[in-house]
UniProtKB/Swiss-Prot annotation:
<keyword id="KW-0539">Nucleus</keyword>
<feature type="domain" description="RRM 1">
    <location>
        <begin position="56"/>
        <end position="134"/>
    </location>
</feature>
<feature type="modified residue" description="Phosphothreonine">
    <location>
        <position position="499"/>
    </location>
</feature>
<keyword id="KW-0677">Repeat</keyword>
<feature type="domain" description="RRM 3">
    <location>
        <begin position="231"/>
        <end position="303"/>
    </location>
</feature>
<dbReference type="GO" id="GO:0005634">
    <property type="term" value="C:nucleus"/>
</dbReference>
<dbReference type="GO" id="GO:0005737">
    <property type="term" value="C:cytoplasm"/>
</dbReference>
<dbReference type="Pfam" id="PF14709">
    <property type="entry name" value="DND1_DSRM"/>
</dbReference>
<dbReference type="GO" id="GO:0010609">
    <property type="term" value="P:mRNA localization resulting in post-transcriptional regulation of gene expression"/>
</dbReference>
<comment type="function">
    <text>Essential component of the apolipoprotein B mRNA editing enzyme complex which is responsible for the postranscriptional editing of a CAA codon for Gln to a UAA codon for stop in APOB mRNA. Binds to APOB mRNA and is probably responsible for docking the catalytic subunit, APOBEC1, to the mRNA to allow it to deaminate its target cytosine. The complex also protects the edited APOB mRNA from nonsense-mediated decay.</text>
</comment>
<protein>
    <recommendedName>
        <fullName>APOBEC1 complementation factor</fullName>
    </recommendedName>
</protein>
<keyword id="KW-0694">RNA-binding</keyword>
<keyword id="KW-0507">mRNA processing</keyword>
<dbReference type="GO" id="GO:0005783">
    <property type="term" value="C:endoplasmic reticulum"/>
</dbReference>
<dbReference type="GO" id="GO:0003727">
    <property type="term" value="F:single-stranded RNA binding"/>
</dbReference>
<dbReference type="InterPro" id="IPR012677">
    <property type="entry name" value="Nucleotide-bd_a/b_plait_sf"/>
</dbReference>
<dbReference type="GO" id="GO:0016556">
    <property type="term" value="P:mRNA modification"/>
</dbReference>
Amino acid sequence: MESNHKSGDGLSGTQKEAALRALVQRTGYSLVQENGQRKYGGPPPGWDAAPPERGCEIFIGKLPRDLFEDELIPLCEKIGKIYEMRMMMDFNGNNRGYAFVTFSNKVEAKNAIKQLNNYEIRNGRLLGVCASVDNCRLFVGGIPKTKKREEILSEMKKVTEGVVDVIVYPSAADKTKNRGFAFVEYESHRAAAMARRKLLPGRIQLWGHGIAVDWAEPEVEVDEDTMSSVKILYVRNLMLSTSEEMIEKEFNNIKPGAVERVKKIRDYAFVHFSNREDAVEAMKALNGKVLDGSPIEVTLAKPVDKDSYVRYTRGTGGRGTMLQGEYTYSLGQVYDPTTTYLGAPVFYAPQTYAAIPSLHFPATKGHLSNRAIIRAPSVREIYMNVPVGAAGVRGLGGRGYLAYTGLGRGYQVKGDKREDKLYDILPGMELTPMNPVTLKPQGIKLAPQILEEICQKNNWGQPVYQLHSAIGQDQRQLFLYKITIPALASQNPAIHPFTPPKLSAFVDEAKTYAAEYTLQTLGIPTDGGDGTMATAAAAATAFPGYAVPNATAPVSAAQLKQAVTLGQDLAAYTTYEVYPTFAVTARGDGYGTF
């Protein structure tokens, strides 16, 4: 079939060409194709005003691959005036399963999300719709902890263009050092996308160190009406030694008795007030003030958008009951103000998850199973073993979204088809009462955690995971992670990154398999036993002589593409006790990388 990736009117030789031409003739909108996307409008005919403000664009996922503008435009027109639609296209003329629609104002965009999310566009095919947010911020990991903000800003301006600001947070244990990563703000999404390409692993080093670069997750945007009722403050950059009593005393000094309760976790805290006025007054008075030897940052908490972010607890019995009154913060933490603090922030240490023997997905809408799953830690978690600040977190794609699970064509988290590991009670078996506390822990370390420990022990730097995907013979989307270890990459650039020889049907399995393959290549066992760390030192000497297999035999390199589309790098944060559950989805950068 003739490739459809070309500039022009976007219609010649396309599927449903007649229907698309009829649509263009009826509406007067332009329809052009460029950089792997087909753009309808932008601006529409007769539009003389400025482009719609931020917050007017929505993401529509789970599109049937043979559905085009002639079906989607009339559906969106019923809700409001369309400024622009961008449908992502593949080389065969099919859509990639998602599109972006910009309405003329925020009200129409919000109505579109409410009306179109889970809309049955065809028999048995439900759309997944959420808000779209431009991302101008990059996460940069691997920065020497002794570097100051000004040094990092100067260095980033030297190697990339369009740098506006750099956000650096001090270490929780030593405020004179940074946390080993920074967030770099660019003047536009395009500038950030170009910088991200330039800074891919192995291309550029900062201060002689290999770096890891990816998108930072955009901050959660909350409307003014909702924020006007918030009476909880978020306080960060506290000393580890600062107690809840010290915090409560400091905030009560502004107005005695105004604080209801305080909950501190590591170097941040949540302060609840009896009314909003007292909270705002305390925020203005104490933001930037030195407390216990450290300047603190004080902001209002941000309530969670229930349409895009749902948290469950294990206590619901897998039924997926939504808790009310949840809050998220500019750091990404979640808080339920109806209870005391429930344990862990959204983005937490990878060890937290890896050590848990059983994580449960709540069963809901057929997308999630309540079978036990242990999720492999992501690069974000490896770098961020403490929560971060208002800059956001290292994200998964060009423009990030917090969305309900199940978005994205062909990628749904479903129950494992393998039989449950249940055993019959046989005659003669004796059931002996026992205390579960006395049991030997049965949790095992996952390969990504073992790989991280090996890299830390040998001072190799944190492993960097890059997700790729390919379409299998049965048209199923398959996944593969390539792994770069900074120190080894600089020593042996010809044989990096580590590329496993097989693809996986699920993203989490692909990550675990890639880590196992890397460990095996380095001659390190992955059983998590006592001998694992004992072999770490030998790995450094074994590495230069290892044999590199033909990693692209099953699928050619040309078929692999960086997985930055929705459903291709979806991290499902499962629940255990009170751990939050959500999905992070991603989109292409809009400049030809799909």
